[in-house]
């Protein structure tokens, strides 16, 4: 068993765990932050995004969705995306790297 604890701060982008093709990332974004300057970023593999706090808008070339604590989003390895923090937001991403 591993217990993982992420960093604290206004802007955090870190990998909490990486083993083979599995990566667990942790992000904290301030309200109104848009990742990658609103440009689509290729997905490194299948991703499950799990908000811990706040609301985040996930934008792909084909759709937009807003997710919050208690929900999750699944992106396929062929997707590209960027995120917009609707509130101050904290989330975890679990990636199966291609």
Predicted regions and their residues:
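Short strand-coil-strand connectors
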Residues: 20, 59-63, 86
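Short, conserved beta-strand element in jelly-roll/cupin
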Residues: 41-57
